[in-house]
């Protein structure tokens, strides 16, 4: 086949006339058979060799090409009677409702016709949409009497999918076609059918195109039997019924039999085009599986457009499970050697790299870093086997391409599905490692939403210098630390850095830093008076930039009425002066996901590479600190003394008694309804309020008995590393009210939630209040709130996925031009300034152009105030 050499400037959509279908056809298909006894295709049947061939042993009878090279050719079936095309049934119904049943003129006066025709021609000249004008014409052309021949009109209905009913009479496709044939070209244009490319009667089929064999290839099963494609099955049905209809018509069969066969032919043609058309039972395989016909090949997630055109399987990609590795840098990905040897990078041989390329070829495909193929300037591909290696090395010269293995430092694209935002696909540098999983730094998990319970990720290897340059410029991990920022460092950082004691293991801590490796080099702080130790704050200061100045409140801040600043015992007031941590603890607020103050400042003042260095160094320091100081948690962290348990129990009993009082007041008619609420709603709201307060108070009691300095579970909750205080108090004190649809549990068996409660009981326990803690015991009602959460999550995921797809399709053509305007692909201005203020959220201070408070703080710190 020759390629198209001319540039395509536009595409016109139209309908094929019966003559066009016959001209395009290379064979008229008559009988419903496929192969003869020897397994060869028969002429004038569905696998006619003129329609194209599959399998390299046969040649196409139309173009002479072998199987695999022949694109295929259309055939045609002459239908015994016309049938309506199911895709145009709605259009036919609209047209018939707008034209006269006798003369087929449009139901408009001559003046109106001239006026609308002029408007359409002007809109076509300006290349504007005709849809609003056509809609207006259809709305106007609904009249009871024809303005041209004075014929009375009857209401026309569409009985889905293709039956047209006028009054009480069902129109046959032949009658429909006759009416459409009488429409003039001028009227056709007003009805939205351009006579240059289509005629209304072509929507009623008299000739059916038969797709090429290459579109519906038959396969040979293991048993040796041939299995035909679903389209071929459907075409066999159409041919069989068409043949029977023709024979019955020629034999003069009764009208009833002819009409039944005609209906059946219409059914088969309808399901051939769309096997999910409403009002028609789907055509099925012998096994009961619905056939996948033309519309199903194109429609939906598995169809041609979304499955094969928008998204497709590609070469030079790899997929495997991901594992955590804190020794891999934030912007790196650990690639298994097995993958590195299989997925290659094409490198042009030059006089500067020829020796290095020869080394790769020498190693061959089995030794890393080697090469798998060499491509000669004439395009021939040679595998770098041991047998051919010497010849390849001898002939290698500039201009050849060597497909070498992946090696350290190569840039690749890393992706985790579902790809919900731009940080689901980022550029990483390769580090080739042993074993069979991708290795990922834990800092990069939040943007990918990855965890290590079996998640798999995809890697794509760039094949051109342009794509590599683009990825390095736009997609590096460190360039996406902001908007949204990520990173949720382990709570061990808090423990190490908040401890006021000094570390006699200072050198051991420093040795894990990427630079400098020894505390005596670079910015090592001076040792204390005895010359042996450093404070942990001094150690942490080593990973901060020299002139960093900032003040903020840490995650553990209690939000006191009057800020105690540096005097607060829990060290929640963070002050950094000229790169030295003076006071404060380092927790999630320092470099957590969406909240990292220090990380945020470093990115904005020193750039993304400095932020990457800080993340790497802080991670290594944290891990070394945890290894040195130890950090673990167990159920003992959720233990409280008996005294606390008694206080909690008394408080909960008191709350349940108050609930009983409310119920008694309701039953005695003493309860006053709240404004705008019924008595029942008032009772439920007051009960929920009492039980909510009881749960909160029991949590506060439990919290007051926790050791804030030594209890590791509490440290994790306070620093934002994992969980919240609510989780701890539910484990320790009281789970609380289980909520379903925003209220207490009401549904159950015969006017009660569980069989062991009294009928109609309204008490706290019988409606889902869990008195005990997770640690003590549980009741059956506990699962109901959790179950609602799971169902909600599943439904929300589907809804948000569909919503995002619609938004992406609607907004994908919008861009911000060089003037800061939002424009679509036609140049139409959507916004004169992006976001109305022209601020890039990624470079703003949480949406603001400038943070004045931060600037004032910096000036004060730099001036020593």
From Swiss-Prot:
Binding-site residues for Zn(2+) 1, renumbered to this chain: 60, 63, 70, 73
Localization of this protein: Cytoplasm
Cellular component terms (Gene Ontology): cytoplasm; DNA-directed RNA polymerase complex
Transmembrane segments: none
Enzyme Commission number(s) of this protein: 2.7.7.6
Record Gene3D superfamilies: 1.10.10.1950, 1.10.132.30, 2.40.40.20, 2.60.40.2940, 6.10.250.2940, 6.20.50.80, RNA polymerase ii, RNA polymerase II, clamp domain
Residues reported to bind Mg(2+): 451, 453, 455
Domain of life: Archaea
Entry keyword set: Cytoplasm, DNA-binding, DNA-directed RNA polymerase, Magnesium, Metal-binding, Nucleotidyltransferase, Transcription, Transferase, Zinc
Basic and acidic residues bias: start-end ranges: 515-531
Record region (Disordered): 500-531
GO-annotated biological processes: DNA-templated transcription
Cofactor binding, per record: Binds at least 2 Zn(2+) per subunit.
Cofactor requirement: Mg(2+); Zn(2+)
ATP-binding keyword on record: no
Sites where the protein binds Zn(2+) 2: 100, 103, 146, 149
Alphabetical list of InterPro entries matching this protein: DNA-dir_RpoC_beta_prime, RNA_pol_asu, RNA_pol_N, RNA_pol_Rpb1_1, RNA_pol_Rpb1_3, RNA_pol_Rpb1_4, RNA_pol_Rpb1_5, RNA_pol_Rpb1_clamp_domain
GO MF annotation list: DNA binding; DNA-directed RNA polymerase activity; magnesium ion binding; zinc ion binding
Catalytic reaction annotation: RNA(n) + a ribonucleoside 5'-triphosphate = RNA(n+1) + diphosphate
UniProt cross-references to SUPFAM superfamilies, sorted A to Z: beta and beta-prime subunits of DNA dependent RNA-polymerase
General function of this protein: DNA-dependent RNA polymerase (RNAP) catalyzes the transcription of DNA into RNA using the four ribonucleoside triphosphates as substrates. Forms the clamp head domain.
PANTHER family (UniProt xref): DNA-DIRECTED RNA POLYMERASE (PTHR19376), DNA-DIRECTED RNA POLYMERASE III SUBUNIT RPC1 (PTHR19376:SF32)
Oligomeric and partner information: Part of the RNA polymerase complex.
Family according to the record: Belongs to the RNA polymerase beta' chain family.
Protein name: DNA-directed RNA polymerase subunit Rpo1N
């Amino acid at each position: 086949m020759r390629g198209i050499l001319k540039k395509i400037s536009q595409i016109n959509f139209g309908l094929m006339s019966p003559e066009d279908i016959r001209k395009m056809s290379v064979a008229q298909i008559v009988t419903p058979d496929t192969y003869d006894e020897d397994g060869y295709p028969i002429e004038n049947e569905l696998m006619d060799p003129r329609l194209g061939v599959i399998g390299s042993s046969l040649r196409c009878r139309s173009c002479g090409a072998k199987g695999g090279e022949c694109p295929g050719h259309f055939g045609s079936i002459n239908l015994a009677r016309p049938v309506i095309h199911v895709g145009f049934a709605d259009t036919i119904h609209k047209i018939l409702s707008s034209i006269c049943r006798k003369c087929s003129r449009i139901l408009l006066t001559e003046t109106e016709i001239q006026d609308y025709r002029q408007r359409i021609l002007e809109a076509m000249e300006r290349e504007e949409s005709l849809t609003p004008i056509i809609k207006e014409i259809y709305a106007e052309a609904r009249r009871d009497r024809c303005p041209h021949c004075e014929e009375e009109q009857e209401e026309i209905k569409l009985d889905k999918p293709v039956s047209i009913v006028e009054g009480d009479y069902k129109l046959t496709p032949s009658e429909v076609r006759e009416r459409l044939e009488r429409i003039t070209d001028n009227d056709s244009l007003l009805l939205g059918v351009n006579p240059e490319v289509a005629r209304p009667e072509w929507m009623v089929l008299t000739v059916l195109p038969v797709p090429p064999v290459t579109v519906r290839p038959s396969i040979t099963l293991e048993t040796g039997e041939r299995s035909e494609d679903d389209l071929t099955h459907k075409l066999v049905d159409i041919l069989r019924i068409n043949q029977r209809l023709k024979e019955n018509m020629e034999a003069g069969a009764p009208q009833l039999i002819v009409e039944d066969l005609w209906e059946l032919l219409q059914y088969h043609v309808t399901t051939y085009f769309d096997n999910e058309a409403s009002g028609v039972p789907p055509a099925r395989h012998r096994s009961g599986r619905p056939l996948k016909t033309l519309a199903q090949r194109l429609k939906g997630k598995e169809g041609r457009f979304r499955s094969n055109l928008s998204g497709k399987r590609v070469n030079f990609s790899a997929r495997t499970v991901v594992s955590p590795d804190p020794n891999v840098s934030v912007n790196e990905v650990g690639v298994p050697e097995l993958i590195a040897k299989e997925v290659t990078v094409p490198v042009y041989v030059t006089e500067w790299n020829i020796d290095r390329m020869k080394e790769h070829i020498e190693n061959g495909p089995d030794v890393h870093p080697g090469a798998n193929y060499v491509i000669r300037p004439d395009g021939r591909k040679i595998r770098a086997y041991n047998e051919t290696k010497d010849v390849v090395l001898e002939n290698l010269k500039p201009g050849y391409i060597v497909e070498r293995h992946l090696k350290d430092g190569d840039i690749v694209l890393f992706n985790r599905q579902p790809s919900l935002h731009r940080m689901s696909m980022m550029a990483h540098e390769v580090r080739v490692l042993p074993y069979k999983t991708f290795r990922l730094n834990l800092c990069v998990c939040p943007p990918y939403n990855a965890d290590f319970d079996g998640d798999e990720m995809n890697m794509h290897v760039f094949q051109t210098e342009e794509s590599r340059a683009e990825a390095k410029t736009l997609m590096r991990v460190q360039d996406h630390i902001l908007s949204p920022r990520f990173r949720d460092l382990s709570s061990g950082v808090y423990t190490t850095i908040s401890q006021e004691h000094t570390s006699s293991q200072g050198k051991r801590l420093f040795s894990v830093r990427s630079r400098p490796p020894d505390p005596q080099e670079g910015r090592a702080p001076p040792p204390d008076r005895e010359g042996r130790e450093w404070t942990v704050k001094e150690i942490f200061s080593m990973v901060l930039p020299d002139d960093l100045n900032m003040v903020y409140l840490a995650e553990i801040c209690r939000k006191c009425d009057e800020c105690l600043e540096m005097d607060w015992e829990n060290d929640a007031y963070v002050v950094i002066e000229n790169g030295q941590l003076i006071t404060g603890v380092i927790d999630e607020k320092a470099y957590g996901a969406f909240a990292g103050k220090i990380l945020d400042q470093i990115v904005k003042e020193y750039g993304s590479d400095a932020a990457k260095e800080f993340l790497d160094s802080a991670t290594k320091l944290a891990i070394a600190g945890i290894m040195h100081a130890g950090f673990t948690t167990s159920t003992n962290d959720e233990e409280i003394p008996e005294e606390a348990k008694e206080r909690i129990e008394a408080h909960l009993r008191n709350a349940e008694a108050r609930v009983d009082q409310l119920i008694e007041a309701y039953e005695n008619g003493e309860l006053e309804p709240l404004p705008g609420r019924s008595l029942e709603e008032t009772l439920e709201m007051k009960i929920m309020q009492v039980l909510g307060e009881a749960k909160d108070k029991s949590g506060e009691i439990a919290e007051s008995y926790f050791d804030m300095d030594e209890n590791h579970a509490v440290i994790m909750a306070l620093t934002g590393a994992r969980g919240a205080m609510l989780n701890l108090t539910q484990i320790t004190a009281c789970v609380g009210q289980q909520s379903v649809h925003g209220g207490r549990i009401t549904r159950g068996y015969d006017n009660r939630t569980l069989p062991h409660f009294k009928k109609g009981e309204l008490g706290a326990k019988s409606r889902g209040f869990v008195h005990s803690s997770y640690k003590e015991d549980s009741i059956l009602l506990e699962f109901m709130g959790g179950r609602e959460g799971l169902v909600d999550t599943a439904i929300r995921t589907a809804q948000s996925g569909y919503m995002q797809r619609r938004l992406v399709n609607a907004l994908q053509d919008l861009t911000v031009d060089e003037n800061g305007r939002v424009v679509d692909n036609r140049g139409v201005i959507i916004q004169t300034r992006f976001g109305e203020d022209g601020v890039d959220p990624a470079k703003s201070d949480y949406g603001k152009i400038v943070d004045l408070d931060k600037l004032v703080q910096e000036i004060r710190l730099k001036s020593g105030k």
